[in-house]
Each structure stands twice: as structure tokens, then as C-alpha cells.
Amino acid sequence: MSTVKLTVNGKSVSADVEDRTLLVHLLRDHLNLTGTHVGCDTSQCGACVVHIDGRAVKSCTVLVGQADGANVTTIEGISKGDVLHPMQAAFRDNHGLQCGYCTPGMIMSAIDIVNRYGDKLDEDTVRHELEGNICRCTGYHNIVKSVLDAAGRMNVAQAAE
């Protein structure tokens, strides 16, 4: 057993966990943050994507000890109260989801993509960057449309700050 301390969605967290505990299981089983989904446990599907220190990471392949001291953000931590994050709003407005299982991971990956590419983001880049996120329901068209729409919203919001 090890004690880990990290910040999750802006709150300090300390947990005693087995050394083999994956971050996704700490989030879901110990902290009840069930928006982060377990799809494959092999880093293939992207349903478990969270941000560690601002970068998208598949939490099913990160040991909790590797995140010790880190700042972790989950899908539950990106909205501001009842106000959706621009990426969440764009997915809603552009019908970027169907069953919703992949959506939290898609949104977390997409936020990271927009943060890295800014106004240089185009459709080909979005499609390439989302290759690690699998959706079984959609043809990805509305997901890509959502990401590009959100990129505009996020860039406008950042410029206003």
C-alpha cells in the first residue's frame, strides 16, 4: 500500500491504494467520479481520457503512483457550475454524441487538441489526433464538427480573458 496525494478537479485528495491501482480505478472506485469510463483497459479506446497537468492521458494505463503530486482534471471538473465548457456545449449543439459512452474521453482529448493547436486546427488534424478515441455509434462527422466549433468558441473565450 502507498499513500498518494494529488489534486483532482481542484480539490486535494489523499488515498491509500495498492501500488498496482490504476488512476481510472482511483477516480471511479475511490472518488466516485464515474464520468471517466473504462472501455478496454488496454489504452485502445480512449474512453478513460483525463488531463494530468493539462495534457490528455489515458487513465487506464497510468498507475496512481505515477500521478502522485499531479493535477488531474476529469470530465466532472471542466464545467463551471451549470455552465458547460465550450467543448461540452459544442458536442451538445452539433450532436457530437449518440450513446455517450465515448463522449467524456472524446471531450477531454478534444480540449487538449484545441489547447495545443489553437487557431491552426483543421479537420484533418482533428481526425488524426482523435485516432486514439473510438466511437462505435457515429461516423465521427459530428464529433469533428463539434471539435472545430468548440475550437472557435475556446479561442474567442481565451482572447477575451
Give short role names for the model-derived ranges.
Residues M1-E161:
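Signature of N-terminal electron-transfer/Fe-S-associated modules in redox systems
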